[in-house]
Amino acid sequence: HYDVIVVGVGILGLAHAWHAARMGYKVLMLDTTASAQGASVRNFGFVTVTGQRPGEDLPMAVRSAAIWKEVSEVVGISIEQTGAWFVAHSAASEAVLKAYLKESSMTGCCLLGPEDWKQQPVGPFLGEIQAILHSPHELRINPREGIPKLLQWLCEHAGVHFEPSAHVQTVGDGWVQTPGACYQADHVFLCLGDRLQALLPEVWRAFDLRRCMLQMLRLEPIGVRLDHPMLTDL
């Protein structure tokens, strides 16, 4: 019997396991593979604070960034980049950046002028620019390295038990059934991403969930190392 069962070893599952283990709970993680294979390791690894809505979203993003800093120190995950440039190529995007800067409660953000970005090594590659908003609050990790490293640390140092190759067939109140065993816990968290559609199709339909895709393109290196990520309009 466990205190917590987490199904899925992507970032959402790892986050639940991290907090549960830090609170002293006995944690079991289950997944069909030995490490995350989906969006957790295919995405950019941004921890984005700037632009979040005030209310619940912004404090949550600020707290998430603080937690990631703690995780990076404890686990030994490198923070690849800090801060961010939000680049506006159109007048409409420039207006959005200025409106955000005027209305946001976040401190430390500022608009950069041509004299600022043209001195940067990447300046010649940016094309025609209207404005750039600089934020010091963002973080970026390498998810292909950081996600497996966090799982390994949880198993080796936080007492988390991990069962790979565990295909969850059915779930109920306080239990999870796989072909080889039935596991019980006080709390069960399903962090399956779009695999939830196969396990609990009625839940998927009830919330009218839809699968989405993100298109990414890896470029040939241009010989420039950026201190911070850049996010641009089209």
Where in the sequence are the language-model features?
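Short loop/edge segments at beta-strand edges and connector loops
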Residues: 31, 81, 113-115, 162-166, ...
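Beta1/beta-strand and adjacent pyrophosphate-binding region of the FAD-binding site
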Residues: 1-12, 28
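Glycine-rich, N-terminal phosphate-binding loop of Rossmann-like dinucleotide-binding domains
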Residues: 9, 51, 89, 192-193
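Dinucleotide-binding Rossmann-like beta1-alpha1 core, especially the glycine-rich loop
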Residues: 44-120, 129
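Helical element adjacent to the flavin cofactor pocket in flavoenzyme catalytic cores
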Residues: 133-179, 183-187
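Glycine-rich FAD pyrophosphate-binding loop
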Residues: 21-41
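Flavin-dependent oxidoreductases
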Residues: 15, 171-173, 181-234
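Hydrophobic anchor at the start of a short beta-strand
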Residues: 27, 109, 188
